[in-house]
């Protein structure tokens, strides 16, 4: 995979695929981490004398332009960070193809407003990529959070132009290689989030490689159910209970320390104001749902992680957006901020959680921008966006 250092960008028009998929509250960006993560590549290209056309997505819009998914707040924030105008183009026809234009940075509106970007039809994606390719001499791939998607701007477009990896993708791949090729031990993985179905593949793969596996978030209740406990109104993937039983058995066979909660925080409804109660996993009431791991479990998780030399964390331990159900996530974040080993925080929710709770990025070894992309890499899957950059 070639990098920015392998190319002279002077006078070139560059198509830069970024991951600028930031969380929004109305038009307010609540975490600009992904924008800041793109700056090293953008600044390198500008310093080298390139003119940049940025392609990026935001969320999953369904039917063309939707104001709530517009990149306008992103363009505005990027402009402030660069102290340069960033021109936002609504349509391809609004983009300038002139490398001598006074505008050094232009951004196409949310690439997912164009249905061809995510089309299942390869020919449709290729035709769209050909239209995009007219605006650049070279493609720079830097949207690590999207490299697991077979989308036109990620897979087809880089195959039509000379291509290189940006600073972010290069750094992400280097970090993930540390986790997969020869991690310092003990090696722990902490997985949270809502659905077991999103993580079952990576759990099955990692259980063969790790020393400690800690499970939290909504998906933990499928594990608790698999152990034979009642889980009340908690989230559960019923069709995966047998798979989860197999994972628990496999962990025992391999002597992997599988951390599951002994207590949880429950509430009658999914609400910020709902009264929170700590209960044992043996006594989850039928009319309550689990929304966080309990304080005893949080302490046990933190203790188990303290001596680890390599840790990968993806997904919060509970509904961290609600203060009453944020303590499990906070305890894990605190423990990981204090370990002397190498820690990778992966996934938008985990990164947003630590920033919301007042932690600094510098307190952790590496904050990854890739949620699903990181997980699929660790699962051993081939990622279309990386394949394209290696072609």
Cite the ranges covered by each PLM segment.
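Active-site loop-to-helix "anion-binding N-cap" substructures in soluble metabolic enzymes
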Residues: 1-391
């Amino acid at each position: 995979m070639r990098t920015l250092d392998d190319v002279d960008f002077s006078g070139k028009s560059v198509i830069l695929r970024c991951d600028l998929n930031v969380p929004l509250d109305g038009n307010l960006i609540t975490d600009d981490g992904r924008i800041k993560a793109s700056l090293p590549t953008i600044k390198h290209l500008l310093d080298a004398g390139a003119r940049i056309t940025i392609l990026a997505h935001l969320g999953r819009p369904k039917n063309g332009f939707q104001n709530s998914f517009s990149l306008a707040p992103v363009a505005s924030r990027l402009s402030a960070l660069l102290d340069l105008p960033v021109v936002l183009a609504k349509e391809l026809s609004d983009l300038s193809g002139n490398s001598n234009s006074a505008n050094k940075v232009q951004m196409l509106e949310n690439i997912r407003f164009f249905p061809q970007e995510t089309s299942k039809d390869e020919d449709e994606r290729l035709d769209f990529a050909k239209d995009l390719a007219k605006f650049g001499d070279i493609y720079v791939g830097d949207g690590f959070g999207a490299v697991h998607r077979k989308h036109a701007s990620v897979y087809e477009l880089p195959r039509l132009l000379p291509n290189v990896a940006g600073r972010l993708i290069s750094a992400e791949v280097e970090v993930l290689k540390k986790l997969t090729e020869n991690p310092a031990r003990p090696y722990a993985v902490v997985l949270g989030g809502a659905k077991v179905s999103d993580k079952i593949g990576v759990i099955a793969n990692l259980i063969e490689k790790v020393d400690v596996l800690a499970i939290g978030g909504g998906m933990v209740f499928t594990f608790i159910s698999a152990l034979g406990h009642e889980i009340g109104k908690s989230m559960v993937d019923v069709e995966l209970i047998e798979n989860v039983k197999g994972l628990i058995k496999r962990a025992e066979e391999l002597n992997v320390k599988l951390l599951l909660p002994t207590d949880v925080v429950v509430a009658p409804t999914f609400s910020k104001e709902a009264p929170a109660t700590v209960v044992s996993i043996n006594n989850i009431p039928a009319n309550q749902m689990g929304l966080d791991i309990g304080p005893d479990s949080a302490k046990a998780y933190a203790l188990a992680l303290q001596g680890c030399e390599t840790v990968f964390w993806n997904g919060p331990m509970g509904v961290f957006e609600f203060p009453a159900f944020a303590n499990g996530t906070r305890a894990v974040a605190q423990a990981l901020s204090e370990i002397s080993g190498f820690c990778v925080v992966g996934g938008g929710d985990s990164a947003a959680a630590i920033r919301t709770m007042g932690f600094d990025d510098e307190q952790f070894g590496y904050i990854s921008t890739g949620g699903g992309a990181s997980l699929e890499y660790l699962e051993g899957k081939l990622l279309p966006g990386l394949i394209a950059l290696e072609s």
